[in-house]
């Protein structure tokens, strides 16, 4: 039996929500290990739609333990709001069903404000990253800068004021430099103490809980957010998120050893999308892009932003397979391609007249690569709702097999609609 890490193999929005929900029914524990409330996912359980951005997907299922690991940056006010929203939908998130790592760094209002100040300034200079303005990056900066306020600090009101002072020394200098007013000590203390009683009951030693669960033979699902190409090290820097999104982060971001991870599942969309700024070699700024966006309902769960759309890029996914150690992929949204006369797949790049089979690390080179396509015949039948290979048109099967060949990883799961049961299981990741 394997513990499973789920990661996005593209720029996020690959359909992880449905796959994680599908897997969470088989898991005993579901863990978030990086990111914050900037990455939304939609779950459909028993006909009810749940939209989550911070909480692990396991919270909507009875009998599952959900964990927010130390690799997450945690907005306490967003947490309280999301818990209240779920309660209104009939889901009680209680401390016996959810644990938050005691050493998790907090996102405060000053982080959100700084995020917005920088994006506004960057917009004027043409260097905008396209963040969600939710304070994710500034919170990670404070964590690395060793001045973050962490969950455990809410329980120690004697030392908390000193930590707030240290944080404000840094932030108020930044705010003055950006032409904004300072934040007062009392304002931040009030912000923290107002939510402390709602957060502290969930606080625990997550590393110990996970070690006990692992030794007891329970199934652990590690739920990644965003995608590989948004990784702070391995993504299209600087147009990335502020955390490591690759599978290796599951260990560091939760407190388990890497040996506890048995299977890495890469969620992979049958075409490619991206939100925000940055390079996108196969982007289609034409009727194909509009078709994919409309058919695929490509709008962000958190921001509502329209996603950029393009053909499947095997170069990027092949690189993601290598960087993550992906054993199998869950191919999603195949049904969006139904009805196209022809479908293109990027098999390589041309850079300054030479053929390459990887994405360069240089920002300048990333902007210059030209996709090299192979054109496949489309299919007239429908893949929507298919639950076995026999239900798929022959050309759709050919497309899937071609992708497997190009990326060097097999399809473990194939999703054919947003409904969780419309899934073709080839390999159960937990049985690896």
Swiss-Prot record:
GTP binds at residues 12-18, 40-42, 307, 333-335, 415-417. Its cofactor is Mg(2+). GO terms for biological process: 'de novo' AMP biosynthetic process; IMP metabolic process. The active site is at residues 13, 41. Binds 1 Mg(2+) ion per subunit. Pathway: Purine metabolism; AMP biosynthesis via de novo pathway; AMP from IMP: step 1/2. Pfam families: Adenylsucc_synt. Homodimer. Plays an important role in the de novo pathway of purine nucleotide biosynthesis. Catalyzes the first committed step in the biosynthesis of AMP from IMP. This is Adenylosuccinate synthetase. It comes from Mesorhizobium japonicum (strain LMG 29417 / CECT 9101 / MAFF 303099).
């Amino acid at each position: 039996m394997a513990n499973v890490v789920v990661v996005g193999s593209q720029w996020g929005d690959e359909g992880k929500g449905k796959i994680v929900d599908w897997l969470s029914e088989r898991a005993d524990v579901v863990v978030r290990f990086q990111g914050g409330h900037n990455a939304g996912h939609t779950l459909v359980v028993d006909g009810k739609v749940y939209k989550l951005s911070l909480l692990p997907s396991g919270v909507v299922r009875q009998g599952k333990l959900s964990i927010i690991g130390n690799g997450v940056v945690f907005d306490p006010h967003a947490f309280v709001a999301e818990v209240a929203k779920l309660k209104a939908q009939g889901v009680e998130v209680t401390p016996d069903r959810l644990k938050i790592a005691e050493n998790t760094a907090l996102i405060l209002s000053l982080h959100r404000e700084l995020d917005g100040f920088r994006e506004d300034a960057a917009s004027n200079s043409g260097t905008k990253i396209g963040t969600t303005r939710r304070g994710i990056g500034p919170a990670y900066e404070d964590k690395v800068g060793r001045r973050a306020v962490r969950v455990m600090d809410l329980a120690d009101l004697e030392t908390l004021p000193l930590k707030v002072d240290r944080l404000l020394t840094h932030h108020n200098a930044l705010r003055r430099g950006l032409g904004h007013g300072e934040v007062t000590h009392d304002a931040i203390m009030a912000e923290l103490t107002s939510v402390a009683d709602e957060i502290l009951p969930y606080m625990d030693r997550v590393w110990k809980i996970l070690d006990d669960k692992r030794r007891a033979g329970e199934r652990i699902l590690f739920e990644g957010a965003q995608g590989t190409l948004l990784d702070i090290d391995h993504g299209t820097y600087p147009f990335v998120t502020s955390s490591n999104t690759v599978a290796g982060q599951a260990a560091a971001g939760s407190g388990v050893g890497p040996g506890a991870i048995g299977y890495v599942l890469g969620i992979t969309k049958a075409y490619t999308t991206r939100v925000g700024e940055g390079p996108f070699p196969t982007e289609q700024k034409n009727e194909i892009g509009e078709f994919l966006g409309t058919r695929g309902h490509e709008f962000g769960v958190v921001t509502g932003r329209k996603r950029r759309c393009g053909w499947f890029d095997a170069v990027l996914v092949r690189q993601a397979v290598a960087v993550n150690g992906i054993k199998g992929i869950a191919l999603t949204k195949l049904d969006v391609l139904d009805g196209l006369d022809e479908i293109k797949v990027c098999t390589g790049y041309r850079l300054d007249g030479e053929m390459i089979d990887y994405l360069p690390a240089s920002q300048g080179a990333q902007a210059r690569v030209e996709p090299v396509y192979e054109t496949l015949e489309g299919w007239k039948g429908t893949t929507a709702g298919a639950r076995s290979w026999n239900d798929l048109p022959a050309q759709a099967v050919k497309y899937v097999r071609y992708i497997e060949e190009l990326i060097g990883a097999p399809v473990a799961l194939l999703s054919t609609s947003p409904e969780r049961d419309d899934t073709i299981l080839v390999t159960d990741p937990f049985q690896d």
